[in-house]
From Swiss-Prot:
Name listed for the protein in its UniProt record: Ribonuclease HII
Native species: Hahella chejuensis (strain KCTC 2396)
Superkingdom assignment: Bacteria
Keywords attached to this entry: Cytoplasm, Endonuclease, Hydrolase, Manganese, Metal-binding, Nuclease
Catalytic activity: Endonucleolytic cleavage to 5'-phosphomonoester
Membership in a protein family: Belongs to the RNase HII family.
Stored PANTHER family: RIBONUCLEASE H2 SUBUNIT A (PTHR10954), RIBONUCLEASE HII (PTHR10954:SF18)
CDD domains with a match to the protein in the record: RNase_HII_bacteria_HII_like
UniProt gene name: rnhB
Gene Ontology MF terms: manganese ion binding; RNA binding; RNA-DNA hybrid ribonuclease activity
Primary residence: cytoplasm
UniProt domain RNase H type-2: residue ranges: 17-204
């Protein structure tokens, strides 16, 4: 596995800045919140195996999530709800979730590194890094925390809204999910601003 560049060696070797990695999960699903995380890693407590959460198994993500929570200097998550996604669109909701994650850090970073090409409004300097979750350890850590927390929420919602298969596909528009939507209807946890859900509501 390619070793990811740590926040310390890449960004703050000379200045000693505290750098937070920030990422979000859940832009594509038809159901559930978008979840973001922010992580400031501790250079004295390295974490082996950090990588883009999509490249890790469920078991690896869960184990790393626990290790990140135990070893990071600071971490926090932030959500944007289905209602917020429908009101302000998924891009703005993703940025809002990232804002909330950074605001939740118990230690204020000097710099935030954001996965992707959009930067939320923050109280500190920030830099966007395309595919940052595959390049920067702190962003990879954030992607893992966000993914694990969102998956746990979809597992919980699967119990409340049985029949949609949420625990399996995590809200993504799989054939099973679309079939269940047609048979069982749209729920309060479905994103009405998304086209497949809109079409069902319109009777198409």
């Amino acid at each position: 596995m390619k070793k990811l560049t740590s926040q310390i060696s890449l960004f703050d070797h000379e200045t000693g800045q505290l750098v937070a990695g920030v990422d979000e999960v859940g832009r594509g699903p038809l159901a559930g919140p978008v979840v973001a995380a922010a992580v400031i890693l501790n250079p004295e407590k390295p974490i082996e195996g950090l990588n883009d959460s999509k490249k890790l198994s469920h078991r690896q993500r869960v184990a790393l999530s626990q290790e990140i929570r135990e070893k990071a200097l600071a971490w926090a998550t932030g959500w944007a709800t289905v209602e917020e996604i429908d009101q302000i669109n998924i891009l703005q909701a993703s940025l809002l979730a990232m804002q909330r994650a950074v605001a939740g850090l118990q230690v204020a970073p000097d710099l935030a590194l954001i996965d992707g090409n959009k930067i939320p409004k923050l109280d500190m300097p920030a830099e966007a890094i395309v595919k940052g979750d595959s390049k920067v350890a702190a962003i990879a850590a954030a992607s893992i925390l966000a993914k694990v927390e969102r998956d746990e929420e979809l597992d919980r919602l699967d119990v409340i809204f049985p029949g949609y298969g949420l625990a399996g596909h995590k809200g993504y528009p799989t054939a099973q999910h679309l079939s269940a939507l047609r048979e069982l209807g749209v729920t309060d946890i479905h994103r009405r601003s998304y086209k497949p859900v809109q079409q069902l509501l319109q009777g198409d």
